[in-house]
């Protein structure tokens, strides 16, 4: 049974993490990440919030990492488009960004410290929804953190797009809450992958033919 996720307090200048299940560091652990940004362009926009959660390979939550709000100057915040100003204003994130003293470098160091407790370097793919976008920002503003992940991504949006095309009725069964905060978006991504695993990716009984084929290609 999956361990439920509970909302950890957002951090502004120092990071803490909440361990929800006693478990060991493992090559098979999955690291989930989400960022909120001022826009879509790493060249012009900046990171304003980042959160991290670790699960095992069965999507059971092992640890909830720091939720970090990153300070950005007013000129960066004033440059946001109407959608971002409205979304991050309603969530209260803009006010938190203005009050925060955490820099991108401090956030990167805190996240790396947390990550190293749960997975070795280059073992976990970066997990999330449309995670390539987060990775672009991370490569620019938190390159040491980006380099700690495996080069592969585990992108739930891939299954979303396949499900919409192959099993549209199943795709309609998962309704996103669209909260647009880093931690809430991670929770939703994990829940979404659990949903696809249960309803879209079916466990098929192993046939003798399949077992023979697997044995023939095994190293």
Curated annotation (Swiss-Prot):
Gene Ontology terms for molecular function: 3'-5'-RNA exonuclease activity; nucleic acid binding
Role summary: 3'-to-5' exoribonuclease specific for small oligoribonucleotides.
Compartment(s) of residence: Cytoplasm
Keywords on record: Cytoplasm, Exonuclease, Hydrolase, Nuclease
Classification via InterPro entries: Exonuclease_RNaseT/DNA_pol3, Oligoribonuclease, RNaseH-like_sf, RNaseH_sf
Similarity-based family: Belongs to the oligoribonuclease family.
Broad class of enzyme this protein falls into: hydrolase
A biological process from GO: DNA metabolic process
Organism from which the protein derives: Ralstonia nicotianae (strain ATCC BAA-1114 / GMI1000) (Ralstonia solanacearum)
A cellular-component GO term for this protein: cytoplasm
EC number: 3.1.15.-
Domain Exonuclease positions: 30-193
UniProt protein name: Oligoribonuclease
Active site: 151
Keyword Hydrolase: yes
Gene3D superfamilies recorded: Ribonuclease H-like superfamily/Ribonuclease H
A Pfam entry, by short name: RNase_T
Regions crossing the membrane: none
Keyword Nuclease included in the entry's annotation: yes
């Amino acid at each position: 049974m999956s361990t439920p996720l509970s909302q950890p307090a957002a951090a502004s200048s120092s990071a803490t993490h909440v361990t929800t299940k006693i478990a060991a560091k493992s090559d098979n652990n999955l690291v989930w990440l989400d960022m909120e940004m001022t826009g879509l362009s790493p060249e012009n926009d900046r990171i304003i919030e980042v959160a991290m959660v670790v699960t095992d390979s069965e999507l059971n939550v092992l640890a909830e990492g720091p939720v970090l709000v990153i300070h950005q100057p007013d000129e960066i915040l004033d440059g946001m488009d109407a959608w971002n100003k409205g979304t991050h204003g309603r969530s209260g994130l803009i006010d938190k960004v203005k009050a925060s003293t955490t820099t991108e470098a401090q956030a990167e160091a805190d996240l790396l410290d947390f990550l190293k407790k749960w997975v070795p370097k280059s073992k976990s793919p970066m997990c999330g929804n449309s995670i390539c976008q987060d990775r672009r920002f991370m490569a620019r503003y938190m390159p040491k953190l980006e380099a700690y992940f495996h080069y592969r991504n585990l992108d739930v949006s891939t299954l979303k797009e396949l499900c919409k095309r192959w099993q549209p009725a199943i795709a309609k069964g998962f309704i996103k809450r669209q909260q647009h905060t880093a931690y809430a978006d991670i929770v939703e991504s994990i829940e979404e992958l659990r949903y696809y695993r249960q309803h879209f990716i079916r466990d098929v009984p192993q046939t003798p033919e399949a077992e023979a084929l697997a044995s023939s290609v095994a190293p």
